[in-house]
Amino acid sequence: MMNALYQRVLAQSGRDVLDIGFGTGILTSRLYAQSCQIYGQDFSARMIELAQAKMPDARLYQGDFSKGLVPELCAQQYDAIVATYSLHHLSDAQKIDFLRALLPLLKQDGCTFIGDVAFRTREELEACRTAAGEDWDSDEIYFVYDELRPHFPALTFESFSHCTALLTLRK
């Protein structure tokens, strides 16, 4: 899924990329090496330090995205917004509000790419939860495509495993 997301970002017409919850910068450092201008927000000062070492010219900010993006990031527009394994910390209602808030930050023909634990239906999620038993992380709130789609008709879902998917939302 990460390679597919990487290729999709590079296929965008522009190179301005916002990464939400970038961690150590594994994905964004690859994009940075391909001349993408990287912007990002992460909760952890340590993650920013590690990512900044890989991408000295990236514009990285500390902040809890569950409270919104920092003003500096809201002042820009992006060709691609990416979030990998980060937005599952938001409730379903927060996900909807957050995704709506991201749409104006996209340039014309821009896309938001979300790579995460995700399911097409609530039934698939519940089956996976049952199969996982005690290994299920109940602190994380995973994506259910069928429940997001009414709010975002342009949203697409591409499965990469029984529990991993790439959701794409075009402007």
Ranges and model annotations:
Residues 94-97, 147:
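An acidic, carboxylate-rich microenvironment
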Residues 85-86:
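Short catalytic micro-motifs in class I SAM-dependent methyltransferases
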Residues 82:
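A conserved beta-strand element that flanks and buttresses the S-adenosyl-L-methionine
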Residues 20:
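Conserved beta-strand/loop positions that form the S-adenosyl-L-methionine
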Residues 1-16, 24-72, 113-170:
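Class I (Rossmann-like) S-adenosyl-L-methionine-dependent methyltransferase catalytic domain
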Residues 96-108:
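A short glycine-rich, Lys/Arg-flanked "PGG" loop and its adjoining helix->strand segment in the class I
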